[in-house]
Amino acid sequence: MTRSHRLLLLLLLIFQTAQRLTTADPNDEACLKNLRQNLEDPASNLRNWTNSVFSNPCSGFTSYLPGATCNNGRIYKLSLTNLSLRGSISPFLSNCTNLQSLDLSSNQISGVIPPEIQYLVNLAVLNLSSNHLSGEITPQLALCAYLNVIDLHDNELSGQIPQQLGLLARLSAFDVSNNKLSGQIPTYLSNRTGNFPRFNASSFIGNKGLYGYPLQEMMMKSKGLSVMAIVGIGLGSGIASLMISFTGVCLWLRITEKKIVEEEGKISQSMPDY
């Protein structure tokens, strides 16, 4: 191979490498484009989320999209919290296959949690709390084996908590409080670790139709405290009544004794001296 051929191959390799670095992964591009199309942005917080940026959102570890974090040229974290966003979550979000953290909390997003999230196999953190999400919690979340955090509190989710979520071995934070969930809390989410439940009652409160441990234990403790309070009030009232009665008797005795002394004085004065 001549020197000119080697130089040509080197230039071609450099060109291909540079092209890969400056061109978005087609999956990430589809993910971002569809996510933006499904979201309404009345406060214009996503004004820089444009097609031109979607075609090149990352350069190594540098992100050109507000709310996005890059790792080796791929989107690996999306944090769009408290931006007054509306609309729904696009099922094409699953195209961001390197995504490890998704935080869309404290917005006004409605609709369902798309089952396609199951394809985010690297997902570790899912925070969709404080929105208007409805429908059931998709059991396909259990296929995201690396999930450490599932936070869905303060939504309008209904139905039962999927039993499969209890099989997520890495799950360390779980919160579905203040929804419209019903049925029994899955055993693997409520079982004890030593003397403590895996997730305590605060993870489940605010769901009128939900029952089972640890909610049941909290209610029993609450009832126990109520009974003790009633007994305490009763005892307190009884003691107070006794004290008042005792004080009244003492006063009556003192008044009676005083009258007797006065009467004895009068009698002694009226008797003649001998």
From Swiss-Prot:
Residues 245-274 are cytoplasmic. Its main location: membrane. The keyword Glycoprotein applies. LRR repeats lie at residues 96-121, 123-144, 145-168, 169-192. One of its GO terms (cellular component) is plasma membrane. Glycans are attached at residues 48, 82, 95, 127, 191, 200. Residues 1-24 form the signal peptide. It is found in: Cell membrane. Keywords: Cell membrane, Glycoprotein, Leucine-rich repeat, Membrane, Receptor, Repeat, Signal, Transmembrane, Transmembrane helix. InterPro entries: Leu-rich_rpt (IPR001611), LRR_dom_sf (IPR032675), LRR_N_plant-typ (IPR013210), RLP_Defense_Trigger (IPR051502). Residues 25-223 are extracellular. It is a single-pass type I membrane protein. Belongs to the RLP family. PANTHER family: RECEPTOR-LIKE PROTEIN 14, RECEPTOR-LIKE PROTEIN 8-RELATED. This is Receptor-like protein 44. It comes from Arabidopsis thaliana. The gene is RLP44.
